[in-house]
């Protein structure tokens, strides 16, 4: 059993005021509040037990706009939470921008897994709200384009009523832990390379003998 404490980095992206900080605060066990704009980015720590091992979560949040140090925010991410307001058309249309932002700030050969979250489900849907059918179509389109490695997990949440917050983060953490383990495995495979055989000249020097040809 690996006794090393695992630290998972989970970032949250999406437009301003869609409720990103509220769902993080809810998951942290803090009461719902109508939060204003946060600083460019902040992070929170939480320890949980999953599969009989303690895991440390580092939950990062950004206020929803580009900034100079975005590379820091996206570095070494294990899972990304992409949020939109199910009653806000623009936040839904901007999802593709955030997906491209994620791709642009991570390694070329690395596809960071993400979970899609629709916020403010406590408010009744109207004709201007984003229908579940449109959301399913969007997910299928992203999957068909090969932007993600696996099927997209989608949750509709309410920080106000604590709806689906725990369920969403259970999935997020499992995905992040799997990504973490895969990265560790790949890192070990890269570092363990067969030693190249020494040339004749190197062997002779090691033996204290030098021949000139």
Curated annotation (Swiss-Prot):
InterPro entries: P-loop_NTPase, Small_GTPase. GO terms for molecular function: GTP binding; GTPase activity. Signal peptide: none annotated. Keywords: GTP-binding, Nucleotide-binding. Gene3D superfamilies: P-loop containing nucleotide triphosphate hydrolases. It holds the Pfam family Ras. One of its GO terms (biological process) is phagosome-lysosome fusion. SMART domains: RAB, RAS, RHO. The keyword Nucleotide-binding applies. Transmembrane segments: none annotated. SUPFAM superfamilies: P-loop containing nucleoside triphosphate hydrolases (SSF52540). GTP binds at residues 14-21, 61-65, 119-122. GO terms for cellular component: late endosome; lysosome; phagocytic vesicle. A motif (Effector region) lies at residues 36-43. Belongs to the small GTPase superfamily. Rab family. This is Ras-related protein RabK1. The lineage of its organism: Eukaryota, Amoebozoa, Evosea, Eumycetozoa, Dictyostelia.
């Amino acid at each position: 059993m690996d006794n090393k404490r695992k630290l998972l980095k989970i970032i949250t992206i999406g437009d301003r005021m869609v409720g990103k900080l509220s769902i993080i605060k809810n998951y942290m066990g803090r009461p719902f509040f109508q939060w204003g704009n946060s600083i460019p980015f902040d992070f929170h720590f939480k320890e949980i037990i999953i599969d009989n091992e303690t895991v440390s979560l580092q939950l990062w949040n950004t206020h929803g706009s580009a900034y100079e140090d975005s590379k820091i925010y996206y570095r070494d991410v294990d899972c990304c939470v992409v949020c939109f307001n199910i009653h806000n058309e623009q936040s839904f249309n901007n999802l593709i921008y955030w997906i491209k932002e994620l791709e642009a700030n991570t390694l070329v050969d690395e596809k960071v897994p993400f979970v899609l979250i629709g916020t403010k489900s406590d408010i009744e849907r109207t004709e201007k709200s984003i229908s579940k059918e449109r959301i399913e179509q969007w997910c299928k389109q992203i999957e068909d384009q090969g932007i993600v490695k696996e099927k997209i997990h989608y949750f509709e949440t309410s920080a106000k009523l604590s709806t689906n917050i725990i369920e969403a983060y259970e999935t997020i953490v499992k995905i992040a832990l799997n990504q973490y383990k895969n990265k560790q495995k790949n890192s070990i495979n890269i570092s363990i390379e067969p030693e190249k055989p020494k040339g004749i000249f190197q062997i002779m020097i090691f033996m204290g003998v030098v021949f000139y040809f």
